[in-house]
Amino acid sequence: VNMTKVKEVGADQYIDTDKHTWSTDGFLKTVDALYNGGYENVAAIYCAGQGGDQGTRAIINNMYGGTFTDAAHTKYTADSAENIKAIQTLHDTKGINFDASIAGGDEITLFRNGTLQMAFCWNIAQQANSDNNAAGLTNDGDEIFPMAFPTDSGDPKLCGGIWGFGIFDNGDEAKIEAARTFIDFIAADPDQVKDSVLASTYFPVRTSVGDIYADNEIMSEYSKFMAYLGDYYQITPGWATARTEWWNMLQRVGSGEDVETAVKTFVDNANAAAQA
């Protein structure tokens, strides 16, 4: 969020700045305060394509405790009452626009230049970006304060990316073994692994690596979000189809289609792909 603007309209009362969390009610009150404070475009449900689509899934799933798939990763569950309520609420909230002209990267640009006051497509790479101003500031110098997605339960579930190494089996055992040796050095050598993680600009998956960002204020603060990482549902069959169906569904809602109808089409098509 643009914390400078949030404080300007007195909405920082809805934010737990220690935990970087807020309730769904607090989120909606913050949007309302910004909208009534003269900021017509508070946030966008961007849906021009799949870029940054993890953000729109996360805001919708978190608001009322919905999920994107079942726990076994066999089917898509976006048609739950919780998800339908979230989509309808976002659609009906003044200041939040379903925008089929932008994807995640465009939303980030609009947030940085002050057009939007919130961004759903956000991660540590954006927080640390210093292309147009110092890290943690908008182009105009406003404070960017990272937030977990709003929830009713107080237990946000963030969409994280799991990055690692892979080896292609090209039939050459010597090359395969060399690749294993290299990966082991990069990811497990006690003298190298810290530098490897630092070079990635992200976080280690093993606690044994230690607190490598102790001297970096932004990274240390952002490490609080690691505890909020949710299910890695991207392994569900039919994933490529589901991603396309998702932003198409959001476009239809933004164009006025009934939410339940739009969501049913998404689930029918995504689950057909999952079962194929």
What residue spans do the PLM features occupy?
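Short, solvent-exposed loop/beta-turn-alpha elements that line the ligand-binding surface or hinge
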Residues: 16-20, 43-45, 66-85, 133-138, ...
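Periplasmic solute-binding protein
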Residues: 1-16, 28, 47-72, 154, ...
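Bilobed periplasmic-binding protein-like "clamshell/Venus-flytrap" ligand-binding domains
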Residues: 36-50, 188-199, 273-276
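Short helix-initiation/N-cap motifs at beta->coil->alpha
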Residues: 20-26, 99-113
